[in-house]
């Protein structure tokens, strides 16, 4: 590690429980590595915000929702609520950094950064280094809109100007792929990527996988069946409906086909879709602490998402050496390279790819070998941590 101050405040708008399944799934290994190297690191999240502060925010929002132009527009109310929540967390981060003596603050979205910038200016913390990671593909207003926080064109333009203002004032801006940074610049109408923007990949996870038969036994799966795995939140932008429909169609020819979906969310619609296609007994849902047995037991991994800045589950499946079929969206081509079968967001293309993998073991072996070759090029945790240390200290 380089010389300099050894402390950083990490700031998210998540709850502590999200460290396992949300942003923390990629962030906590970095936090743990920094702590192991003698750093003082705090992970500031929603649970650190006092109840009285949340109550004040809610009362303020209730008054704001009565204003002309806001009262009759629920989408605007939702955006204001999300923005206020993040600005308040950023404000808390500025106070926490001052009170606890942090010399670097890393915020995990630009709306948090807005609140921090306001607090930093108000508290006179001009010497405090700070930066932002953009976790979506492109600008944050695009990412939140695609995730269901509906924004009309006028509101989108205003939010993008606000985002550009915040990013310009940060000491660093990172995204997990170069493609994501390039899209961010296009979304914000910038002529080039600023020099303080950096692409820093997620680190390759260390995996100690069981043999397939042992993994199947531990999960109660039959090793004679063909198991397809999908991982992610059960939300519309993941398009698991395409995966369910494709598997249901293929199951008419391959009755041993089973689909396993790991993730939080409303599974009722997907179950109904499977039931209607006669596939209901072959779809399985789970929320688990340890995904490694599933990677070890699965025969193929599939992602049907319409957007990914990086695609952490894709990356994990690649590192596990699984044959991977992924939609070629966002930063996925950069991360997966030749290690995955890249397809459009299309049921027919997915069926064709899965059909080939089920019917031809040599195809699976070839794709698994490509995954292993691509995985060998992935950065390790030590390299990733060193990139962040350079930002925090310089």
What name fits each language-model region?
Residues 22, 362-392:
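A charged, aromatic-enriched C-terminal amphipathic alpha-helix characteristic of glycosyltransferases
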Residues 271-288:
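Nucleotide-activated donor-binding/catalytic signature segment of Leloir-type glycosyltransferases, i.e.
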Residues 287-289, 294-298:
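Short alpha-helical donor nucleotide-sugar binding micro-motif in glycosyltransferases
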Residues 323-326:
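Short hydrophobic beta-strand element within catalytic cores of glycosyltransferases
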């Amino acid at each position: 590690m380089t010389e300099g101050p050894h402390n950083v405040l990490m700031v998210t708008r998540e709850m502590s429980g999200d460290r396992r399944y949300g942003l923390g799934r990629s962030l906590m290994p970095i936090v743990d590595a920094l702590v192991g190297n003698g750093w003082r690191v705090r992970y500031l999240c929603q649970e650190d915000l006092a109840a009285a502060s949340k109550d004040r925010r809610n009362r303020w929002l209730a008054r704001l929702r009565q204003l002309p132009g806001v009262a009759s527009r629920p989408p605007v109310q939702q955006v204001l609520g999300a923005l206020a929540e993040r600005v308040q967390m950023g404000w808390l981060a500025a106070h926490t950094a001052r009170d606890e003596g942090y010399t670097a603050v890393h915020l995990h979205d630009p709306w948090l950064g807005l609140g921090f910038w306001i607090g930093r200016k108000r508290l006179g913390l001009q010497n405090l280094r700070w930066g932002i990671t953009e976790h979506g593909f492109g600008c944050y207003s695009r990412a939140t809109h695609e995730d269901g926080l509906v924004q009309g064109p006028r509101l989108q333009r205003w939010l993008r100007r606000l985002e550009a203002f915040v990013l310009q004032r940060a000491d660093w801006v990172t995204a997990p792929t170069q493609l994501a940074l390039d899209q961010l610049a296009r979304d914000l109408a910038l002529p080039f990527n600023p020099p303080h923007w950096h692409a820093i990949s997620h680190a390759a996870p260390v995996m100690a996988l069981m043999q397939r038969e042992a993994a199947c036994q531990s999960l109660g799966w039959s090793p004679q069946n063909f198991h397809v795995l999908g991982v992610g939140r059960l939300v519309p932008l993941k398009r698991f409906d395409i995966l369910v429909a494709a598997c249901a169609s293929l199951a008419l020819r391959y009755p041993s086909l089973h689909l396993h979906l790991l993730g939080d969310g409303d599974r009722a619609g997907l179950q109904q879709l499977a039931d209607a296609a006669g596939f209901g007994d072959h779809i399985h849902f789970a929320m688990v602490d340890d995904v490694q047995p599933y990677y070890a037991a699965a025969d193929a991994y599939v992602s049907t998402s319409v957007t990914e800045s990086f695609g952490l589950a894709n990356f994990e499946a690649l590192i596990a050496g699984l044959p991977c079929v992924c939609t070629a969206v966002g930063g996925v081509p950069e991360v997966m390279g030749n290690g995955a079968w890249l397809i459009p967001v299309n049921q027919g293309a997915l069926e064709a790819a899965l059909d080939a993998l089920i019917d031809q073991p040599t195809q699976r072996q070839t794709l698994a070998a490509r995954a292993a070759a691509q995985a060998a090029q992935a950065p390790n945790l030590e390299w990733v941590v060193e990139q962040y240390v350079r930002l925090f200290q310089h």
